[in-house]
Amino acid sequence: MVDKVTEAAVVGGVDTHKVLHVAAVVDQNNKVLGTQFFSTTRQGYRQMLAWMTSFGALKRIGVECTGTYGSGLLRYLQNAGLDVLEVTAPDRMERRKRGKSDTIDAECAAHAAFSGIRTVTPKTRNGMIESLRVLKTCRKTAISARRVALQIIHSNIISAPDELREQLRNMTRMQLIRTLGSWRPDASEYRNVTNVYRISLKSLARRYLELHDEIADLDVMIAAIVDELAPELIKRNAIGYESASQLLITAGDNPQRLRSESGFAALCGVSPVPVSSGKTNRYRLNRGGDRAANSALHIIAIGRLRTDDKTKEYVARRVAEGHTKMEAIRCLKRYISREVYTLLRNQNRQINSIPITA
């Protein structure tokens, strides 16, 4: 009897968290065999895998949040040669019926992996695209911090004493920043209001310049990765390094998980959504998908609308047919997504050919 249980195929599900993961296992009849908590360490991953395989041959595992709390577990399971699926959020009706707990979420993940619903192929996150994503995230926060520093500089100048404001009039942005950074206020005179403004403005200017240099260094690294991964993409009209890097991140290290160009368009939020009923036959704007990728496609479309004659003719023809200019641009974004998908799938270099060094 024990041998039969061991040989039976089972499916696992994991609800991921920061400190503890909750695992569940279902049998061939989708019946829950057990649930258990495990730590989010390599030892915890080993214990989880051993516990799951104790019920039988592990067919596949459904994991929630493979890009955040479940990223470490995903890498461990993939390195072990297991079939891993990413499980999306539970159905709202099911949530209302059963309630919410970590154990219930783990069981729902196992049920989803068993039936193949609410599951997608996860990004592998072990290639150069993951490096690109980390650099882009760092750059985004640096740009945000630089913008905040500049805003505070302008705010302080507005409320500064007149003698300081007169010195800073009619300057460009970088002239202003470098002037403030070259000031040498007396740090011991922090009780004097005018001198405190000098100290504050100098500190903010130095912060701005440091972030400016940091962003420039990150841009060099991002451009090098994009040139190596997708040289043909960056050669296309109006596709810069920012847009190209975002589209690469959206596709992921394993773009083969995108089975068709329409799937990539839906992922980017540029595929029309049917809203037909009865005699009404129409489509509406897709407000879903990766909005960062949608923004990248929009930037490319606007750039081509300014520089490419064929794009201008296409938009003019669409407008003449009765569409608005915005609707024509949405159609254009759909065509651009098809072009990008083809380039990503047909590129000579495999995106994940150079793994991250452990």
Model-predicted regions and their roles:
Residues V2-D27, A109, A142:
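Gly/Thr-rich phosphate-binding beta-strand-loop-beta motif of the actin/hexokinase/Hsp70
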Residues Q43-R60:
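Short, basic/hydrophobic alpha-helical segments
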Residues I234-K235, Y241-K325, S353:
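Phosphate-backbone recognition surface of nucleic-acid-processing proteins
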Residues Q78, V84-P122, E130, V134, ...:
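Short alpha-helix plus adjacent loop in nuclease-associated cores
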Residues V19-Q43:
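Short glycine-rich, Thr/Ser-proximal phosphate-binding strand/loop in the N-terminal lobe
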Residues L58-Y69:
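Short glycine-rich phosphate-binding loop at a beta-alpha junction
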Residues A320-A358:
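Basic, amphipathic alpha-helical segments enriched in Lys/Arg and hydrophobic/aromatic residues
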